[in-house]
């Protein structure tokens, strides 16, 4: 891509539009500024805005095959080389308000040595973190270091979420050791979040590994080394995910066993109660048939004697159950 003027990047629909100064900071893009590899420009767009869609359709700075990709809804992380540019789709933990972290958000990037165009449909916190570093003068200096910074920030958020899920699993295990059954759906949600992360972070790890191995002209050897370290760190996170998924399976079995044991214990208790009161139920039914000649019917202490007999009978049955070790 040849050098171009800054006015080609200026439009009202941009979320962020800056030029990297090559020293870790940023400057506004001027209309007469010449954009080159030493000071690449970064344009961040919200692809849901009509102004961004119009700019993508008419700009000559990106290939035709990239326009729809930047404005679309890519599902899985991927990387595609297109001439001197590279199209990359990455996934981020959703840290927006009133959203579940496992409802991952996507960031799509077309990057060359002179131009970085990133798009999103929902806010990506990693973008804001990179922008903050740039405003403080501690950010990336070129296209390669920008991509490494984004990958590192995304992986940091993923690692933190994996650690949070790990802590939740430990809490569930501790509760089960204390014979506490977790609220319904809690384990299912954790397991779903683990599986979603596993589904999308595996290809994302592969994207990072491929970028580190590609001889991209706008990446330096140090950038490739850092990208490989990020891929390795994400790979270790995936191993933790596999272990956590296996632990949730064990937890599910333990919860089922605990609930079955509790149900059996209740059923056993009810059976013992029925056994204790079965003889008394028979006698009360026998003496309550309202027929003439009931024994003790005319005796002044007949009812008291009958109640005492029932108490003795219940006590005798309970003693027998205790002696038989059923109680």
Swiss-Prot record:
Which species? Pectobacterium carotovorum subsp. carotovorum (strain PC1)
Protein name as annotated: Zinc transport protein ZntB
**Its Gene Ontology molecular function terms?**
cobalt ion binding; cobalt ion transmembrane transporter activity; magnesium ion binding; magnesium ion transmembrane transporter activity; zinc ion transmembrane transporter activity
Q: Does the keyword Coiled coil apply?
A: no
Keywords in alphabetical order: Cell inner membrane, Cell membrane, Ion transport, Membrane, Transmembrane, Transmembrane helix, Transport, Zinc
Disulphide bond pairs: none
Q: Tell me the domain of life.
A: Bacteria
* Recorded catalytic activity of this chain's protein: Zn(2+)(out) + H(+)(out) = Zn(2+)(in) + H(+)(in)
């Amino acid at each position: 891509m040849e050098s171009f003027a800054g006015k080609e990047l200026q439009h009202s629909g941009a979320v962020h539009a800056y030029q990297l100064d090559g020293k870790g900071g940023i400057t506004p893009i001027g209309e007469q500024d010449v954009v080159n590899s030493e000071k690449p420009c970064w344009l961040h767009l919200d692809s849901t805005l009509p102004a961004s869609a119009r700019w993508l359709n008419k700009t000559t700075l990106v290939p035709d095959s990239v326009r729809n990709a930047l404005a679309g809804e890519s599902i899985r992380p991927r990387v595609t080389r297109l001439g001197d540019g590279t199209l990359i789709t990455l996934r981020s933990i959703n840290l927006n308000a009133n959203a579940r972290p496992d409802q991952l958000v996507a960031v799509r990037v077309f990057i060359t040595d002179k131009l970085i165009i990133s798009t999103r449909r929902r806010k990506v916190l990693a973008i804001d973190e990179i922008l903050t570093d740039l405003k403080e003068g501690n950010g990336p200096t070129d296209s390669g270091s920008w991509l490494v910074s984004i990958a590192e920030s995304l992986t940091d958020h993923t690692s933190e979420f994996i650690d949070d899920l790990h802590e939740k699993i430990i809490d569930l295990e501790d509760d089960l050791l204390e014979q506490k059954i977790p609220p319904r759906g809690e384990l299912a949600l954790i397991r779903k979040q683990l599986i979603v992360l596993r589904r999308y972070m595996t290809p994302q790890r592969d994207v990072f590994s491929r970028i580190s191995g590609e001889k991209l002209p706008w990446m330096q050897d140090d950038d490739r080394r850092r990208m490989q370290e990020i891929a390795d760190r994400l790979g270790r996170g995936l191993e933790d995910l596999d272990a956590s998924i296996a632990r949730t399976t064990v937890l599910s079995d333990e919860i089922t066993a605990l609930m079955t044991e509790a149900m059996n214990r209740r059923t056993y208790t009810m059976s013992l109660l029925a056994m204790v009161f079965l003889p008394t139920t028979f006698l009360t039914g026998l003496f309550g048939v309202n027929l003439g000649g009931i024994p003790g019917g005319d005796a002044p202490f007949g009812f008291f004697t009958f109640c005492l007999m029932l108490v003795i009978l219940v006590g005798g049955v309970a003693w027998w159950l205790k002696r038989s070790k059923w109680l």
